């Protein structure tokens, strides 16, 4: 089902983005309203403590984007989200406190159409709160511009290939990536080359995401741990929030290293950090794709993989929720092909099976 949010997206591009905050805590509503109001691109047009009040305000105020708490009295956030996504969809950012239960619920919210998920800022974060709120503002602003229409029709059948065991696939994504990855990962065959994923996501939520994908996919899926081997048939998801995921080769095998470091392109884990390490560790035997997301994270790393002789792809604008990261890759000529989301798994598998390699780029000219 295509979702008609063209008018809201156009209005958001033209002026200030209208935000409705839905949370049962008055203190959280006030803190979010104050924080979001510091961004000149955003206008908080209303707040609501529950689903019924939010529904009335959505009808009256026509917000461009909703921030939604999942744990609310009477009607919970997930049930409310599903109800309005069916009848009058609005781009939505889930802002949730992390528990194991809330992590699973957040994944169901993403499947129901939420654009992004943010860990609820701690009101006791002190001096770190302004930086946290800058990230929240940027992601709320980007969410209002996301395309909510999923790809039509069934995704392609898996491609049987004779890919070698030491080949590595890699995917990077941000806004809209949960839905994109949930769609394409199930179509990689069970014994596909090892597959590495960086999805921008808060600390703790990636474990729930990995469990959800493991139930959907032919390959095994789990959250990566330091020292994990990159093996055929296994998808490793970079843990959210605290460290970067890099790959090192030693003794003829590739291993995951979770390393400390400042955010790159405002992101940790960073797609660039993973891609750059892969270019050094396994460059000619890597196929990598940069999927939907805001910003530029991953573009420079994708270019490094292409220059090292690997195969590189990026998601096209029409199938991206936010055409930011793939656009940056296109502008750098980092991707040898720009593909629809549904075409990416087959092209990556065919690249792994092909005897020829993409030409290495000596320059960006």
Swiss-Prot record:
What this protein is called in its record is: Protein-glutamate methylesterase/protein-glutamine glutaminase 2
Q: Which family does the record assign?
A: Belongs to the CheB family.
- Comment on protein domains: Contains a C-terminal catalytic domain, and an N-terminal region which modulates catalytic activity.
NCBIfam families, per the entry? PRK00742.1
Q: Where in the cell is it found?
A: Cytoplasm
Which GO cellular component terms are attached? cytoplasm
Q: Which UniProt keywords apply?
A: Chemotaxis, Cytoplasm, Hydrolase, Phosphoprotein
Single GO BP term: chemotaxis
Report the residue ranges that make up the Response regulatory domain in this protein.
18-135
Keyword check for Hydrolase: yes
Summarize the PTM comment.
Phosphorylated by CheA. Phosphorylation of the N-terminal regulatory domain activates the methylesterase activity.
Enzyme Commission number:
3.1.1.61, 3.5.1.44
Q: Which InterPro entries match?
A: CheB-like, CheB_C, CheY-like_superfamily, Sig_transdc_resp-reg_Me-estase, Sig_transdc_resp-reg_receiver
Q: Which residues form the active site?
A: 174, 200, 297
**Pfam families recorded for this chain?**
CheB_methylest, Response_reg
General function of this protein: Involved in chemotaxis. Part of a chemotaxis signal transduction system that modulates chemotaxis in response to various stimuli. Catalyzes the demethylation of specific methylglutamate residues introduced into the chemoreceptors (methyl-accepting chemotaxis proteins or MCP) by CheR. Also mediates the irreversible deamidation of specific glutamine residues to glutamic acid.
Q: What is its main location?
A: cytoplasm
Which residues are recorded with the post-translational modification 4-aspartylphosphate?
Answer: 69
Report domain CheB-type methylesterase positions: 162-355
User: What GO MF terms are annotated?
Assistant: phosphorelay response regulator activity; protein-glutamate methylesterase activity; protein-glutamine glutaminase activity
């Amino acid at each position: 089902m295509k979702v008609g949010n063209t008018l809201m997206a156009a209005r958001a591009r033209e002026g200030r983005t209208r935000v409705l905050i839905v949370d049962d805590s008055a203190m959280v509503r006030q803190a979010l309203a104050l924080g979001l109001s510091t961004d000149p691109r955003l206008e908080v047009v209303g707040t609501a403590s529950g689903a019924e009040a939010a529904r009335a305000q959505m009808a009256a105020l026509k917000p461009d984007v909703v921030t939604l708490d999942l744990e609310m009295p009477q009607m919970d956030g997930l049930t409310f989200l599903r109800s309005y996504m069916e009848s009058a969809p609005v781009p939505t950012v889930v802002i949730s406190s992390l528990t194991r239960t809330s992590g699973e619920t957040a994944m169901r919210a993403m499947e129901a159409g939420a654009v992004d998920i943010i860990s609820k800022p701690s009101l006791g974060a002190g001096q770190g709160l302004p930086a946290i709120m800058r990230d929240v503002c940027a992601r709320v602003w980007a969410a209002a511009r996301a395309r909510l229409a999923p790809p039509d029709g069934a995704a392609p059948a898996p491609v049987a290939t004779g890919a070698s065991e030491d080949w590595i696939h890699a995917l990077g994504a941000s806004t809209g990536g949960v839905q994109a990855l949930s769609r394409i990962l199930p179509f990689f065959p069970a014994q596909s080359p090892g597959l590495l994923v960086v999805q921008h996501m808060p600390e703790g939520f990636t474990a729930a995401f990995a469990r959800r994908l493991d139930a959907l996919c032919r390959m095994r899926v789990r959250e990566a741990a330091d020292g994990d081997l990159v093996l055929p048939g296994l998808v490793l998801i970079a843990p959210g929030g605290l460290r970067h995921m890099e790959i090192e080769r030693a003794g003829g095998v590739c291993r995951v290293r979770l390393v400390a470091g400042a955010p790159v392109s405002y992101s940790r884990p960073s797609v660039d950090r993973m891609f750059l390490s892969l270019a050094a560790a396994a460059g000619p035997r890597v196929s990598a794709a940069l999927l939907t997301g805001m910003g530029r994270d991953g573009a420079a790393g994708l270019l490094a993989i292409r220059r090292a002789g690997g195969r590189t792809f990026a998601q096209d604008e029409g199938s991206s929720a936010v055409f930011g990261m793939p656009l940056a890759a296109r502008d750098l000529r980092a991707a040898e092909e720009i593909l629809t989301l549904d075409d990416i798994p087959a092209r990556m598998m065919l690249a792994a099976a092909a005897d020829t390699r993409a030409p290495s780029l000596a320059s960006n000219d």
